[in-house]
Amino acid sequence: MGKRLLILEDGTIFEGQAFGADLDVTGEIVFNTGMTGYQESITDQSYNGQILTFTYPLVGNYGINRDDYESIKPTCKGVVVSENARRANNWRKQMTLDEFLKSKNIPGISGIDTRALTKIIRHHGTMKATLANEGDSIEHLQDQLRATVLPTNNIEQVSTKTAYPAPGVGKNIVLVDFGLKHSILREFSKRNCNVTVVPYNTTAQEILNLNPDGIMLSNGPGNPQDVPEALEMIRGVQGKIPIFGICMGHQLFSLANGASTYKMKFGHRGFNHAVREIATGRIDFTSQNHGYAVSRDNLPEELIITHEEINDKSIEGVRHRYYPAFSVQYHPDAAPGPHDASYLFDEFLELIDAFQLEKASK
């Protein structure tokens, strides 16, 4: 393949080498600071509609394997790398990154200065961008880019359309799919949970009819304020069933209890974000992927901040003062990234036990 252009909304143009699928795309450009884990990132549906830049200088060197998918159908718009490894060496490798992107109809660009690109995003914030093959009129592409309105139904696009089971012999968990990563299912499977995955717009009564022991609110893409039906569902189940929210689930849980959210300048996307547990001072290194956060302004009395990001002090976790419910902004399931916070799945199951014991004693 030949040359390919990356055109930013602010007018900046990068020229590089095309790889992956042969098509033009427009999306929100973001960056990920992880040194590995590109397969998990590309298949993470939280990147729905986004052009994903990897800051690490070499990507693709261990190929793509069958084990590390976070979704069967990746929904990111494009991939930007400094260097795409033309040869991949790993005993699990099934195909190269280039072959994988072609098979999933995702275009890529390599050979550009991703450090310079990342500095632009950090300074100006995330913005629209276009990946286009050389030869197209730049003026026409820029006009199209300016005129493009990015969709807001990201969660609707990636959520399952019908409920499905992930059988187990332990606790019954209803997992509300806002764009879930398969690693969340794997964490529950390790703990022998019987999981039912349901669409994002499932009602509170429909969830209660499944007789769950606990409810998990998954990660997902976009703006949490775009799914008001999820807020209504959360209000209808909290206090009746223990709740655990991750990433998008954290934001929705907070909104449902009267908090507000805001769009971050360039978000948290990487696997090395240090988070402090306020009560103990414990530091966990966490995997994160989000462009919105819960605001400290006017945080309702019902929510107690439990975790914060060390660098920017953004809220990384809350728990409800009166109900058996808590949430975190980061990914305790990792995939990719450190497993420092995987204990939160155990704490959720312990919360379920305590709730059921208290309920039985009344």
UniProtKB/Swiss-Prot annotation:
Keyword Nucleotide-binding among UniProt keywords: yes
Span of domain Glutamine amidotransferase type-1: 172-358
EC number: 6.3.5.5
Catalytic residues identified in the record: 247 (nucleophile), 331, 333
Highest taxon in the source lineage: Bacteria
Start and end residues of each stretch annotated as CPSase: 1-169
UniProt GO BP: 'de novo' pyrimidine nucleobase biosynthetic process; 'de novo' UMP biosynthetic process; glutamine metabolic process; L-arginine biosynthetic process
Classification via InterPro entries: Anth_synth/Amidotransfase (IPR050472), CarbamoylP_synth_ssu (IPR006274), CarbamoylP_synth_ssu_N (IPR002474), CarbP_synth_ssu_N_sf (IPR036480), Class_I_gatase-like (IPR029062), CPSase_GATase1 (IPR035686), GATASE (IPR017926)
A Gene Ontology molecular function term of the record: carbamoyl-phosphate synthase (glutamine-hydrolyzing) activity
SUPFAM superfamilies: Carbamoyl phosphate synthetase, small subunit N-terminal domain, Class I glutamine amidotransferase-like
Pfam families: CPSase_sm_chain, GATase
Enzyme category, top tier: ligase
Reaction it catalyzes: hydrogencarbonate + L-glutamine + 2 ATP + H2O = carbamoyl phosphate + L-glutamate + 2 ADP + phosphate + 2 H(+)
Subunit description: Composed of two chains; the small (or glutamine) chain promotes the hydrolysis of glutamine to ammonia, which is used by the large (or ammonia) chain to synthesize carbamoyl phosphate. Tetramer of heterodimers (alpha,beta)4.
Protein family per UniProt: Belongs to the CarA family.
Record's function text: Small subunit of the glutamine-dependent carbamoyl phosphate synthetase (CPSase). CPSase catalyzes the formation of carbamoyl phosphate from the ammonia moiety of glutamine, carbonate, and phosphate donated by ATP, constituting the first step of 2 biosynthetic pathways, one leading to arginine and/or urea and the other to pyrimidine nucleotides. The small subunit (glutamine amidotransferase) binds and cleaves glutamine to supply the large subunit with the substrate ammonia.
Protein name: Carbamoyl phosphate synthase small chain
Lineage: Bacteria, Bacillati, Bacillota, Bacilli, Lactobacillales
